[in-house]
């Protein structure tokens, strides 16, 4: 079955796996998903991920989820910009999540990065998701 929102599908898989206290979750691979997973890993929301490549050019990521005292590190992960309604933000209008305790992942001309890195680089872009 075709997925209309691949990034939203990955975020939903992560959210559902953490609610079920799974250690790992598989998701189809893409460059955008890899960049978002890189940001989640560098910000400490996931342990890491590995890539599996199949002969037909298809890739799959296995994401290692992170828990602290038995509770998921990611309390909330939510898609902001969707295929039907794109959301863009200038650097001065970049939304803060939980007064700076969470992050917003932004796709900018300089790459996919967390909101604080986008402010530091003085670039705006498409607001992909919020993580808290």
Curated annotation (Swiss-Prot):
The keyword rRNA-binding applies. Signal peptide: none annotated. InterPro entries: Ribosomal_uS8 (IPR000630), Ribosomal_uS8_CS (IPR047863), Ribosomal_uS8_sf (IPR035987). Keywords: Ribonucleoprotein, Ribosomal protein, RNA-binding, rRNA-binding. GO terms for molecular function: rRNA binding; structural constituent of ribosome. GO terms for biological process: translation. One of the primary rRNA binding proteins, it binds directly to 16S rRNA central domain where it helps coordinate assembly of the platform of the 30S subunit. NCBIfam families: PRK00136.1. Belongs to the universal ribosomal protein uS8 family. This is Small ribosomal subunit protein uS8.
């Amino acid at each position: 079955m075709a997925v209309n929102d691949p990034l939203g599908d990955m975020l939903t898989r992560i959210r559902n796996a953490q609610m079920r206290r799974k250690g790992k979750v598989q998701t189809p691979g893409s460059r955008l998903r890899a960049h978002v997973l890189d940001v989640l890993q560098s910000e400490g929301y996931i342990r890491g991920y590995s890539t599996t490549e199949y002969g037909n050019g298809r890739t799959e990521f296995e994401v290692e989820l992170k828990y602290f005292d038995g509770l998921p590190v990611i309390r909330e992960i939510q898609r902001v910009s969707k295929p039907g309604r794109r959301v863009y933000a200038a650097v001065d209008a970049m939304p803060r999540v939980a007064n700076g305790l969470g992050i917003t992942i932004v796709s900018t001309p300089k790459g996919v990065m967390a909101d604080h890195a986008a402010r530091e680089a003085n670039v705006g872009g498409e607001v992909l998701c919020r993580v808290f």
